[in-house]
């Protein structure tokens, strides 16, 4: 679970007022998932074949990494010293809302572990150990160890993320978390343990952006699993109604839908069947 560390370890629950920002300028930040994102996360994930279409691109990578033959959702980094290496996903997004899961073991992150998005022109290799994603104006990245956001890092200062952190606090990012790219609103956000961390980057509209990570840890393996996407059209009323019913039931009771006095077709609809 995502944790905030000061002198000891505390569990972060974004719904708990204890962890709302203390700084006045952060009070207006919205930590509630947008409606479209909430609906997408309630949908079943796409098939494995579709996940492969959105997976890592073995032809768009640093030479020090490769996509595994036995699991094409995972890439492996060779243990090359004084090198930072990155890889892009196969699909560049220009419209719609897209969510993918990154699985990156905490023990395999090292000093510079960065996750984000990039244009096709962003560099994928650098000599030395550096925050490669976010290093210039072609990429946007979250450094998982430093809890900092980088974009055009050579010219712009980094920002704290999640924004509720105080200067003496560290947020421990778990092995798996979600990345949400909304090309219609032009935002990049992250979800940890089901909790929306707020918008990390804005101003992305009009670009073509690819999932990207940069790594320095030898033999690290990073998995990307595309969950689903939504086109920019208005949300259908039927989908909103289904979401309302599922919310009213709660995740723990979705298995009871079969026992409800409803037509079989409606039960199937509520279960995304």
From Swiss-Prot:
<keyword id="KW-0833">Ubl conjugation pathway</keyword>
<dbReference type="InterPro" id="IPR001870">
    <property type="entry name" value="B30.2/SPRY"/>
</dbReference>
<dbReference type="GO" id="GO:0016567">
    <property type="term" value="P:protein ubiquitination"/>
</dbReference>
<dbReference type="Pfam" id="PF07525">
    <property type="entry name" value="SOCS_box"/>
</dbReference>
<dbReference type="InterPro" id="IPR013320">
    <property type="entry name" value="ConA-like_dom_sf"/>
</dbReference>
<dbReference type="GO" id="GO:0006511">
    <property type="term" value="P:ubiquitin-dependent protein catabolic process"/>
</dbReference>
<dbReference type="GO" id="GO:0043161">
    <property type="term" value="P:proteasome-mediated ubiquitin-dependent protein catabolic process"/>
</dbReference>
<dbReference type="InterPro" id="IPR003877">
    <property type="entry name" value="SPRY_dom"/>
</dbReference>
<feature type="domain" description="B30.2/SPRY">
    <location>
        <begin position="33"/>
        <end position="231"/>
    </location>
</feature>
<dbReference type="GO" id="GO:1990756">
    <property type="term" value="F:ubiquitin-like ligase-substrate adaptor activity"/>
</dbReference>
<keyword id="KW-0963">Cytoplasm</keyword>
<dbReference type="Pfam" id="PF00622">
    <property type="entry name" value="SPRY"/>
</dbReference>
<dbReference type="InterPro" id="IPR050672">
    <property type="entry name" value="FBXO45-Fsn/SPSB_families"/>
</dbReference>
<comment type="subunit">
    <text>Component of the probable ECS(SPSB1) E3 ubiquitin-protein ligase complex which contains CUL5, RNF7/RBX2, Elongin BC complex and SPSB1. Interacts with CUL5, RNF7, ELOB and ELOC. Directly interacts with MET tyrosine kinase domain in the presence and in the absence of HGF, however HGF treatment has a positive effect on this interaction. When phosphorylated, interacts with RASA1 without affecting its stability. Interacts (via B30.2/SPRY domain) with PAWR; this interaction is direct and occurs in association with the Elongin BC complex. Interacts with NOS2 and EPHB2.</text>
</comment>
<comment type="function">
    <text>Substrate recognition component of a SCF-like ECS (Elongin BC-CUL2/5-SOCS-box protein) E3 ubiquitin-protein ligase complex which mediates the ubiquitination and subsequent proteasomal degradation of target proteins. Negatively regulates nitric oxide (NO) production and limits cellular toxicity in activated macrophages by mediating the ubiquitination and proteasomal degradation of NOS2. Acts as a bridge which links NOS2 with the ECS E3 ubiquitin ligase complex components ELOC and CUL5.</text>
</comment>
<dbReference type="InterPro" id="IPR001496">
    <property type="entry name" value="SOCS_box"/>
</dbReference>
<feature type="modified residue" description="Phosphotyrosine">
    <location>
        <position position="31"/>
    </location>
</feature>
<feature type="domain" description="SOCS box">
    <location>
        <begin position="232"/>
        <end position="273"/>
    </location>
</feature>
<dbReference type="InterPro" id="IPR043136">
    <property type="entry name" value="B30.2/SPRY_sf"/>
</dbReference>
<comment type="pathway">
    <text>Protein modification; protein ubiquitination.</text>
</comment>
<keyword id="KW-0597">Phosphoprotein</keyword>
<comment type="similarity">
    <text>Belongs to the SPSB family.</text>
</comment>
<dbReference type="GO" id="GO:0005829">
    <property type="term" value="C:cytosol"/>
</dbReference>
<dbReference type="GO" id="GO:0019005">
    <property type="term" value="C:SCF ubiquitin ligase complex"/>
</dbReference>
<protein>
    <recommendedName>
        <fullName>SPRY domain-containing SOCS box protein 1</fullName>
    </recommendedName>
</protein>
